[in-house]
Regions:
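Membrane-helix interface segments
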Residues: 40, 60-61, 147-149
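Juxtamembrane/interface alpha-helical elements of multi-pass membrane proteins
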Residues: 68-178
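Transmembrane alpha-helix interface motif
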Residues: 1-40, 46-52, 164-255
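Interfacial helix-loop-helix linkers and transmembrane-helix boundary segments
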Residues: 44, 60-69
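Alpha-helical transmembrane segments and their membrane-interface exit regions
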Residues: 49-59, 73-77
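Helix-loop interface residues and adjacent transmembrane-helix termini in multi-pass membrane transporters
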Residues: 17, 36-37, 58, 131, ...
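Interfacial loop-to-helix junctions that mark the boundaries of transmembrane helices
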Residues: 35-39, 63-67, 105-112, 230
Length: 255
């Protein structure tokens, strides 16, 4: 279970001690501003501030880069699609293997706008994820009346995903010690065997876990975590942050 603590950051940072409900509501408000922003300046500002917060709470650069790699790829893809296949104002053109590609100025602006929204929204969620334990986040979602069945499924998936990861590491190390990944064909065959073993283990674990939970009185309803009262300082700080960012967004919209 050491994987559960592999992304533990600076517990002394004030952001990690803020109520998960306050952080979640603030993130939703800021996310709404980012998505509805008519320009790209505000989403980029939210992205920069969020990345700075992630670094401030002790998130390793490698972890941060891995977390942002997929949304960054999507943002770049959208930007390129908008640049070359959308718009009416030609910007520049070039040929590749006889294929003429024309970039459009208005398509570039639209692509930058969408890409900035993607990165701004992902960065806000990253701050909440890196600064909040998963169980506290699920408790906050339960307080927000998210369907309990979704929360239960997320908790089970989060808990037993690490067990499957440990099983995968054991099987992979055994295969590697037996030269199971020497060569492309042999490595592909070993990977298929690994995937099949994990599927079988997942079914076996689900049956044993279900039996154990029923024997311990599980009736389909997971007990909810008790929520502590809101702290006025945290609520006030969150309101000031949201209002301040809202004022900046409104100012840039007017300008």
């Amino acid at each position: 279970m050491h994987h559960l603590h592999s992304h533990t950051h600076l517990a002394a940072h004030p952001l990690t001690r803020v109520d998960a409900r306050v952080k979640l509501l603030s993130a939703v408000a800021l996310l709404t501003m980012v998505i509805s922003s008519p320009g790209s300046a505000f989403p980029l500002l939210a992205c920069v501030l969020s990345i700075a917060l992630c670094l401030a709470i002790g998130t390793p650069l490698r972890t941060l880069a891995l977390r942002f790699s997929e949304p960054l790829f999507i943002a770049v893809t959208v930007l390129l699609l908008k640049l070359f296949f959308s718009g009416n104002s030609p910007f520049f053109s070039f040929s590749i293997a006889g294929l003429e590609l024309v970039a459009h100025r208005d398509g570039l602006m639209e692509g930058v706008r969408i890409a900035s929204r993607i990165m701004g929204g992902v960065s806000l969620l990253a701050v909440v994820g890196f600064s909040t334990p998963f169980t506290d986040l699920m408790a906050a979602l339960s307080w927000l009346r998210v369907p309990q069945v979704l929360i239960d499924v997320a908790l089970f998936a989060w808990r037993y995903l690490f067990l499957l990861l440990e099983d995968a590491q054991v099987v992979y190390n055994a295969q590697k010690n037996r030269l199971g990944y020497v060569g492309y064909r042999r490595g592909l065959s070993s990977f298929g065997t690994l995937a099949g073993v994990l599927v079988i283990k997942a079914f076996d674990n689900s049956q044993s876990i279900t039996t154990a939970m029923v024997q311990r009185g599980y009736d389909g309803v997971m007990p909810r975590s008790l929520q502590r009262p809101f702290r006025m300082a945290e609520v006030t700080g969150a309101l000031l942050l949201v209002l301040g960012m809202g004022a900046v967004r409104l100012l840039w919209t007017v300008i």
